[in-house]
Regions:
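Localized sequence-composition bias
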Residues: 1-167
Length: 167
């Protein structure tokens, strides 16, 4: 199954936007991933920083505040996490037309894993664009030693250190 999923997701810059839904007033035009060295890639090392660059189109005639969430889903279903500006109380305001938003995921805590990426864009809690399995990336081995914390069993996730920048 993992092999099939890896082969069914394009590793090129030609992403598939066929599996999308939402109102469409604000839409994701492209998503690019960069490593700590600024190189566009889909392979990362443990403890690396992933820079998610989202190019968005605001079709409305005014500035709008939006919420963006990036879901990282393990291909083997062993991991599911979300990066979102709402978690950090960070406002993202888009101008009319094209906009660029960056989410930096710092100190990548994964090793030897493969992930699918979903992107959700909302305005006033209404889904404007939801693109599923838009991109595939993998984390290859690396050396990473870090102080860790064991979360209680009733805690349903882990916090991933990230920040948002509007360009």
């Amino acid at each position: 199954i993992t092999h099939y999923q890896e082969k069914s997701i394009s590793n090129s810059a030609e992403y598939s936007f066929s599996n999308r839904s939402g109102l469409g007033n604000i839409m994701l035009e492209s998503l690019n991933l960069f490593n700590s060295l600024g190189k566009e890639t889909q392979q990362f090392k443990t403890s690396d920083t992933i820079k998610f660059v989202l190019n968005l189109k605001n079709k409305m005639t005014k500035k709008v505040n939006i919420q963006i969430a990036i879901r990282l889903k393990g291909v083997d279903q062993s991991f599911d996490a979300m990066l979102a500006n709402e978690y950090l109380d960070k406002n993202i305001t888009l101008n009319q037309g094209s906009n660029s938003v960056v989410c930096n995921l710092h100190n990548l805590p994964f090793s030897n894993s493969s992930f699918l990426v979903n992107v959700l864009i909302k305005k006033n809690q209404v889904i404007e664009d939801f693109v599923q399995d838009i991109l595939y990336f993998e984390v290859i081995g690396g050396f990473f030693q870090k102080e860790s914390y064991v979360y209680p069993n009733n805690y349903k996730g882990i916090y991933l250190e990230h920040d948002w920048i509007i360009k």
